[in-house]
Each structure stands twice: as structure tokens, then as C-alpha cells.
């Protein structure tokens, strides 16, 4: 029998397609890209390591030839694909029909080197009909699409690898720059600047409830007083909070009411008679929205479902791979003839002929740069499955997103909504005031009635309940005729303040990038994830708040490399990539122009070389906060975080404080808090100074004035740095404390990030009192360890969270690990990624797919090397050597040598309310220390053998303690 190998991107997609193809076909996944540019020096092949261009992974001297490598975690899988290819009679590359998919197919062809016929198969939905049609109509690999993807990858590498080191040297270590991420960051920063410069304006008006002779009531609002319009929000200047000036530099002719004036007017208007001066009614129609493209799906996923962009795309990916929707990365809103017929048929059957648009609706892409042709995102197949029919098949996220996609697709072929807009003006006169006669007033009342809902029966943008939304959209006014009188029954003064422009949410940032022509459907979610992962933005509710680091980075790029973060320039790069994809531009000349420059234009490489010396690191890191101007307070971004200074006084800026929330009173308060060094005295045993410090994560005490410090300990709740005594500081520095030995293991009392706890081997238990750390005994500790272990806020950790059973493989368990929930089958583990759900909604096939894609064998712990003898340490200011005291020694002296740490997932550093996780564990310096003899109460000297603080480079230690930049 003929054996045809079909390769797609993901295991889930492979399983769905294999069901449709049947015998004679083997469907395997590539698990994404199999090759890429080297991610580190370790991945660069030995023969290229000495090449000047090797770090880029691009030979800039040879037409930007890419150095592609198979990463270590893909080598085993690539070997498997090679074996399958060798046994196949034909190879079909069925990756996605876009640039990335075309590139994956090309890389597979290059790496597998098949000796059998090769075909390229493309489809936009995973249904039996679509797959069989694609098999019957193969094509060749589109080299133009491959060239465009290679150009995009090269651009990103050149931009990132050239610009990021500038940020490391001039702003802070470990920052990154990116072709799109830096522009997205600039958008966030510019919006925050608008908020920081914003000055609120205030005004008052009057809200009325009027009644007709028939006792029908309706709302109205005071709009004019003595023929002059009342001020509204649009009349105020955002920079001053005052009324805008007209062409003659005079404020606009409007009335600004104070609270007192508004209350006086309201009292004089209550129960007044008003006359209908005019009543207008105009019809309106509203057309349905086009079916979803990637950006609008992400925007509505956020507005309607509360999903982030990445969550939306994860759910959409699963729906696509399961055969429920069409391809989810598209900027075309068009529907195929088959889909149009399916939508129209469903409208007719579910809503009736009256709700069907007279003619099929055809939608064209708004973007002139719409990528390779796809359909809109819609339910898959020639007939759409209703959401109700899929309730038992889809997980929560998948069902809710499918419901959204289905409604939008069906509504796109429905009839227009029709209605009427009403506008009524009421004139009247106030009663006399104490200061004179009454005043003429004019009130406005507006209404909206929907006569025929049309497509709104199925879909209302921004709402999850169309019927409720329709009611909210209607404000019905009673029939009113000119000269008819009504009564102003209730008059309520209403105060208002202008609001700063709203921060970007994930949805509005996608909309903003799309409006600028920046990014593509495949990149929006990753851009948003990247700017958060890199520390340029943080979520506050649904808003994206730029960090101070983002301000400094954007300032540097705007002032010295303005073109690289220019919106038009970045959009032009997207257009150029489209031109390469269409075969109208060539990759190599384009990259040469970008990197080296041409026609008098300077490329990125010479630009950085010429600008580097001109960059004033202090200037770009100094941020002039509008609310602090004239106060002498400067805000800076140091190598270890943001801080402010006033003369010699410095203070860290809390990480959770948004830039626009830093006001002068708050800044003065932060600067007045204890900061800097507080000498407390000399430790009588070691001769080292004891110093109190204010760190980013709270106050702490430090033993020694050398760098790095000998020992540190955070203060307990209730301790005050300004009144802390030497005796108290020395007591804190005895922690971690060796309590004794239980079941052959040392028991330690420690103060950690989440409070006081006991540690025995790999087991730990929280205790209720910080002070108890100094007095807890072995019997009390053993009683604590006999209690069930609790994690977080009391959720007991007991066995797997869920178990997935399979007929063809061992069960997969969902467990809670120290780095979050993970899947395991006993041989491989796969951690659920950041932002993924807890796993409660995972289906068995999801668990299998994740484990197959990301599963890794647990790493075995390397055998420990023989510990080196610690060098003696000298006390500061003295020539004596501090000797090590045995734990069994009866003397209760406390000494300084490095201390042995019990194994624990998170090592508390400086007991300063923060922790160092596994990436820094390699920095731990182990020192040989004898264990305390069993069943002996430890002396004070045992503290010298307590868990060691992590031995870090001073730069890292400063970063974690939050020490102010010099």
C-alpha cells in the first residue's frame, strides 16, 4: 500500500486531519518551526563561531545569508520526521497558508531532503471536504512568501541585535528593542504623557425629568442660559483645565456654572412650565458589521468576553485545529460563496425572511496591505453548526468564542436595523432670584427608537446579550408637538469633570496598531505579550500601563533613532514585506538598504555607530514629570529600577505606582520616609557594622559594609527602621535559625516572602507568628509537620488536580507544581504556560496535545561536587580572621561564614520580602558545613550554619534589594 506522509504544524491539527484521510496516510506534526536563527552563542556551529557576523546569525557580507540551526529541543523530533520521510512514498507539506506556514514548509524541505515526490497542500478550514479538495489540488512552495518571511525574520534580528545593546549600555541591562514592540511601547508612553500633562476642568449643569399632561415622563438636560450655550467637556483645554481660547485668544462664548449657581437654578426651575420649541424626528439605518478578521476578533474578545489577545488566539487556534472555524490569522473580511449561502440559510431558518438582507453582502478589506488571501473567520463547513449544538464538545473559552464568531458571521448577512432619532428643545423661564428677574432657559431631550432590529437581533457590538442591548439603546420620547407645554418636575444639579484620555487596553492597542498599518494578524497577540514580558507595560485592570523603563527607552529611541520608532516608517516596512511577498521587491537589496543604507540614507548599523557616543545616558533616563516641575524633584530610571531624588535625598518609586499617579504630595511623602543608610552600631562578636537600609521590597538590616554584604535580614511587620535598635537588628540577623533535627533532617525557622515558616528537608510549613521564629522548639515543629500541608490560601495539596484517561496510552495527570500547574504522564512533564488557564477546562485531547508539543523528560539532578573549603573572612576594619564555630559548641556566639542552605524551591534573599527563583540557583556558593548532632538543642553558633544567602554578583544583589542607582 502507498504510504503518504503529511506534515502539519501541530499534533491537534494532525489528529483531526488524519481522521479525514484514513488509510495510506500518515499525518505528523512539525510542532511549529523546526529551524531558526541561533538564539544564543551555544547554538552557533563551531565552524562559524569566529565569524564577525555569527552573533547575528546573518552573514551581512554574503547577501544576508541566514544561518539556520535545529534547536536542541527539536533535534529528536526532526530525526523522527526524517525516518518517516525515508519510509514514505510521497511527502505532502500541509502547513498554514501564510508566510510563516510557507516558511515552515520550506524549512522542512531543506532539512528532510526527501527523495520522494513532494507536494504543497493548503486549506483554510479543517473539514473533510476542504481537506479532500486540498489533497486533489496541490501546488508548489511559494518562494515569494518564503522570501518575505525570511526578510521579516532578518529585519527583526537586525533591529533587535543592533538596538538592544544600546539600551543595555544607556538605560538598563536585559532590555530589548523590537521592530514592532518598540513602536507599540511608544504608543503606550505617548498616551501616558497625555494623561500626565492633563489638567481636569470642571463644570455643572442640570438634569431634568419632565412630564406631559398625560403624566408621561422623559429626561432632558439644560443646554442654554439666556441664549448662551452651557459649557461641555469639549470646551476645556486638556493642558490647562481652563476653557479653550478662540481665534481671538479669548475663551469661547459659553456659560460655566458653579455648584452654587447650578443649585440655585435647579431650585428655581423645579415644577416650572416648559414649552416645546421644536420637535424633530429623523429615520436612520444601521448596517451589520463584517465578519471577523484577526484584529476585530481580538477586540471583541476583549470587550465581550474579557479575554486578552493571547487567550483569544489560543482558543481560536484550538477551534481551527478541531475543524470548528476557518483559519484565524487573516485580514480579509470576505466570505466565500459557500459560507455566504450557509449564513443566509441560517438567517432564513432561524429569524425569517424579513431578517435576511435582500442581496448577499460582500465585504472588502479596509487595509490596503491585507496579507495573502484568506476568508474571514467564520464557522467551518458548508453549513454552520449552531453554538447550542456544540455545548458538550467545546471547553468554556472555545464555546464562548465560537458563539461570538457564529453570531458575527450570521449577522453579516442580515438586514439593516431601522429606527428613528428624536430631538426636542424645551424653552422656559426660571423664577426670580434674589439678585434680579428670572432667566431664559433652553433644555434638550433626545430619543432613539428601533423600529426593526434587523441584524441587531443576532449581534450587538460590545454586548453579550443582544436583546438587553437593544433595550439599552432605546430612549423613547412621548409624542410631543410644538407649543405643547410640559412640567419640569425634577431638576437635579450635576457636576462634571473632564477625564484624561483612556489608557490603551489590549483591544484598543491592537486597533491602534492596525490603524497605523503596523503589525499583521499573526503578530498582534505576541506583540502585546512581549511588551509585558520585557517590563515595558503592566496590566492594571484591563489597561496597559507603561513603566518608567518604557519612558526612558522610548526617549532614547525617539531622540537618537527617531526613524526606527516612526509610525509611518514602521508601516512602510510592513508594506515592503508585502511587496516582497508579491514578488515586486527583492529581499537582499531591501535588507542591505535597511542595514547598511543606500542613496544617501543611513542604515541601522552605521546609524548606531555614529549615535552611540552622542547618547547622554543620564539625560535619557531623567523623566520630567509635569506635576513635579519646579519642585527640584527628579525622576530617573536607574540600572536597578526607577527612583527620584531631591538634592541628596533619594527614594525608590513603588513599582505598582502608575506614572500619571505620581503627584507632588506623594513624591514628598516618599522622599520623607526613612531611606539611605541607618548605622545601628557594631556587632560585638564579628566587629562588623550593622546598618539599616530601605530597599525596594521593604526595610532590612545588613551586617557589614562590604560589597556584597555579609548577611541581610528583612524587618518584621511592626518593626520601624527609624527606631530600630542594635539589639533587635542582631536578633533579626540570627535568622534563618536552626531549630534542631527531626527524622534525620535539620529543621530551620525562616522568614520568607510569604511570611514565617519551618523547613525540614524538602518539606515546609507556615507558622502564624514572626516572633515564633526565635522560640519554636523541635516538639512544636514536629507537631506542625504532622499537619496537612497547605498551599496559598488554604487549598490542600493532595494528589493530582485532574486525571485524563486514554485507551491507547497511560493516563495524564494535571498537578500543581512550584511553578504552577503542569501535566505529566510519569515520563514527561509540560508546564501550563503563563496566561493559560488553571487547567480546569482542559479536554483530554488538549492535555495530550500539550504534553506532545511541550513535554520534556524531568531533568536529573547532577551529582554534587566535593565542597570547597571556605576562605576565612576578615572583619571590616580589623585584621583578625573570623573563625568558624562548631554547631555543637556550647558558646552561643554568632559568626559570619557562609551558611549551608536546605534545598527549597524559592531561596529567600536577604529576608527582604522577595525571592530568587530557579534561574539564579546556579549562583549559590556551597560551603562545607557539619550537620548538627542529632537530638541536641542548637546553640547560637548554629545560626552560622543556617541556610546560605545566595552569593550573587553585587549588581544582581542591588537589583533584588532595590538599592538606589548611583
Describe each PLM feature range.
Residues 1-153, 162, 167, 236, ...:
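Intrinsically disordered, low-complexity regulatory segments
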Residues 2-5, 15-16, 25, 164, ...:
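Basic, low-complexity terminal or inter-domain segments flanking catalytic cores
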Residues 29, 38, 190-191, 203-206, ...:
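Accessory interaction regions appended to the cores of large information-processing enzymes
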Residues 80, 86-87, 126-210, 281-285:
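C-terminal or mid-to-C-terminal helical accessory/interaction module adjacent to the motor/catalytic core
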Residues 96, 298-300, 304-312:
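A conserved hydrophobic secondary-structure block that centers on an alpha-helix together
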Residues 265, 269-290, 295, 301, ...:
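Pre-Walker A segment
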